[in-house]
């Protein structure tokens, strides 16, 4: 089953005080030109659920989308785009950081990276920052169609090797993804589905005395 199918827009917020009361959340984040909005639209099988722009940094707020199981997908502002006023950029950084560190409903992070340029400095900073939460991370190496099959295999292997220091201490996984070729949808569903199943199981198990 596609967890993201039929997702619908719920609300958008620009301050943590306006965060909605939700059960569980999966957040999507990435550099401003990594293909995050396209990945969300592909996973949800919706042409314009998340706005796709040729201008990086278009997502300027935290957008919530309700999934058919009642949980939520959260589209976070892209990072690394500097062509905005400093005050606006600082607000994005604080909003993003506070949400990732403080949001109790957040059970995992889907991090989108361009397969041609994975693990750039800001991506590594994001991994280091989120690592302190202990929550799982799944990386989508987007735009994989821009690489040959051999390049895809090589890139995936290299990224897995570079992630080893993180995966030794944290649940972190990575896959190839292409919005154009609809590549990797099932794998992303399985990974996120396992997070939701684990969270549901933990919530329903009796508390230890």
From Swiss-Prot:
Its cofactor is Mg(2+). Residues 22-198 form the EngB-type G domain. GO terms for biological process: division septum assembly. It comes from the Bacteria. Keywords: Cell cycle, Cell division, GTP-binding, Magnesium, Metal-binding, Nucleotide-binding, Septation. One of its GO terms (cellular component) is cytosol. Necessary for normal cell division and for the maintenance of normal septation. PANTHER family: ENGB-TYPE G DOMAIN-CONTAINING PROTEIN (PTHR11649:SF13), MSS1/TRME-RELATED GTP-BINDING PROTEIN (PTHR11649). Belongs to the TRAFAC class TrmE-Era-EngA-EngB-Septin-like GTPase superfamily. EngB GTPase family. This is Probable GTP-binding protein EngB. It comes from Neisseria meningitidis serogroup B (strain ATCC BAA-335 / MC58).
């Amino acid at each position: 089953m596609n967890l993201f199918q039929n997702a619908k827009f719920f609300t958008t917020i620009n301050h943590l005080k306006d965060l909605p009361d939700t059960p569980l959340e999966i957040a999507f984040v990435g550099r401003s030109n990594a293909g995050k909005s396209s990945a969300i639209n592909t996973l949800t099988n919706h042409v314009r659920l998340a706005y796709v722009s040729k201008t990086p940094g278009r997502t300027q707020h935290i957008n919530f989308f309700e999934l058919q199981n009642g949980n939520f997908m959260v589209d976070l502002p892209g990072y690394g785009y500097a062509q905005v006023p400093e005050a606006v950029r600082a607000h994005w950084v604080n909003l993003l950081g506070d949400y990732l560190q403080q949001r109790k409903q957040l059970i995992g992070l889907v991090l989108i990276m361009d397969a041609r340029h994975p693990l750039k400095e800001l991506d590594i900073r994001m991994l280091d920052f989120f690592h302190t939460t202990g929550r799982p991370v799944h990386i989508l190496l987007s735009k994989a169609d821009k690489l040959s099959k051999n390049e895809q295999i090589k890139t995936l292997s290299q990224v897995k090797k570079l992630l080893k220091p993180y995966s030794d201490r944290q649940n972190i996984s990575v896959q190839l993804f292409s919005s154009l070729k609809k590549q990797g949808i099932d794998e992303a569903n399985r990974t996120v589905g396992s997070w939701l199943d684990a969270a549901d199981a933990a919530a329903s198990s009796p508390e230890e005395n």
